[in-house]
From Swiss-Prot:
GO terms for biological process: DNA recombination; regulation of DNA-templated transcription; regulation of translation. This is Integration host factor subunit beta. Belongs to the bacterial histone-like protein family. It comes from Cupriavidus pinatubonensis (strain JMP 134 / LMG 1197) (Cupriavidus necator (strain JMP 134)). GO terms for molecular function: DNA binding; structural constituent of chromatin. Residues 75-92 have a biased composition (Basic and acidic residues).
Amino acid sequence: MTKSELVEKLAARFPQLLLRDADISVKTILDAMSDALADGHRIEIRGFGSFGLNRRPPRVGRNPKSGERVLVPEKRVPHFKAGKELRERVDRNLTPSSGGSGNGHLTGTPSGKGPQGAAPGSPAVLHEGGGLNLARS
C-alpha cells in the first residue's frame, strides 16, 4: 500500500474528510513518527506494533571498485516489530489461496520474486478482500 492509497482509503472511510485534509493528516502522522524516531524515541501503537532504533556498530568495509578497506561509521536504523494482534491477523489471513506460499514468507521464492512475479522493492498491494501481497528483497 502506498501513501496515496492510504490517503484515499482514509478519505473513503470518512466522507466528511476532503482528500486534501486526509493527505495532510497522513503526512502529519508520518512526520511526527519520523521526528520521534530521529530524536531517538520509541513509538508504540498497541495492537499494531512498535517502531524503534537498532544500532549498527562501526565496521571495516571494502570499496567494491578498488578493494580498499574503508571504515563504515556507526548507524542507527529504524526497526519495526509487529504486535501480537497484527501477527495473529496476518497469520490467520496467510493461506495458499491468498497468495502466500504457505511457508510463512510473503516473497514466495528465495529469488525474492513475489507470488505474481513482482520485483523486489515493489510496494505492498492491499486487495479489497483484505489480502496483502508484498514483494520484498
